[in-house]
Amino acid sequence: MSVMFDPQAAIYPFPPKPTPLSDDEKQFYREKIKRLLKERNAVMVAHYYTDPEIQQLAEETGGCISDSLEMARFGAKHAASTLLVAGVRFMGETAKILSPEKTILMPTLAAECSLDLGCPIDEFSAFCDAHPDRTVVVYANTSAAVKARADWVVTSSIAVELIEHLDSLGEKIIWAPDRHLGNYVQKQTGADVLCWQGACIVHDEFKTQALTRLKKIYPDAALLVHPESPQSIVEMADAVGSTSQLIKAAKTLPHRQLIVATDRGIFYKMQQAVPEKELLEAPTAGEGATCRSCAHCPWMAMNGLKAIAEGLEQGGAAHEIQVDAALREGALLPLNRMLDFAATLRA
């Protein structure tokens, strides 16, 4: 598998950590959010990687906790006229693409994603233009502009199946933006894959030697790994999969202890699924390095109770997602291709 570009040369500045709230303040904002959701005919959709108190609030108010695509699909089917998206900006864009008639609000539009930041549209479009014989497949963790440049959008849950399908048709692939997921898919399928060189700042930090030491401490533990992790981590795994697939694996594996190599935000729903099991964080520090993300996306952490309340109350340019109509049409085509393909897998 060839490599052409290394956006990892860029260091993305992290946002400041949110100011902690007192218990009284948390209760105040929880009640305010519940009231505002009713007043605005809104529903809250939260990603697995948001903080536990945010996921809990989404549950309590009849919302959704899931991966980015299922968040958008839930919102599209829901009767609410407004969606409050607790996640990062590309998730709000995806929701707007699938529900253009709805108001899409976010706690902050400054919640970025290193995969999105690492795949700027101008550079990526030039990369695609240099390889016109290849089918362009992009991960859901990309901007609306990058999606519109692609032939297919894909989630980690069906990435292997889609690339197998395209390979069976004799197609050569451009994969973007996550190099680790692209490498995993290529090894699983044997397809001709040309990879963009982005990475998730959370999964890229997992350390092999530190994980080996942890496995010695917990020799009977199973290792669950998201395929955005480095190859050396994936090769150690007992189960590899998307967020929803890892939760399913936690339920089906017989092990009583689980080491989890993905954002620790997933622990909220995973522990609900397996309350009898012990969940352990895979190490992101060690081997001469300290952690930057420390197994939690700093932009996901921006989705606090106060910010959610402000997003619902204020709306406007600081909180509302807008997607240009022409760009939306361009991004909707590869998204719909993926949805149709996923439907054939479920049939």
UniProtKB/Swiss-Prot annotation:
Keywords: 4Fe-4S, Cytoplasm, Iron, Iron-sulfur, Metal-binding, Pyridine nucleotide biosynthesis, Transferase. Its cofactor is [4Fe-4S] cluster. It is an enzyme of class 2 (transferase). Pathway: Cofactor biosynthesis; NAD(+) biosynthesis; quinolinate from iminoaspartate: step 1/1. It catalyses: iminosuccinate + dihydroxyacetone phosphate = quinolinate + phosphate + 2 H2O + H(+). Transmembrane segments: none annotated. One of its GO terms (molecular function) is quinolinate synthetase A activity. It is found in: Cytoplasm. InterPro entries: NadA (IPR003473), NadA_sf (IPR036094), Quinolinate_synth_A_type1 (IPR023513). Signal peptide: none annotated. Binds 1 [4Fe-4S] cluster per subunit. One of its GO terms (cellular component) is cytosol. [4Fe-4S] cluster binds at C113, C200, C297. Iminosuccinate binds at H47, S68, Y139, A140, N141, S156, H226, P227, E228, T243. Its EC number is 2.5.1.72. Catalyzes the condensation of iminoaspartate with dihydroxyacetone phosphate to form quinolinate. HAMAP family: NadA_type1. Belongs to the quinolinate synthase family. Type 1 subfamily. This is Quinolinate synthase. The gene is nadA.
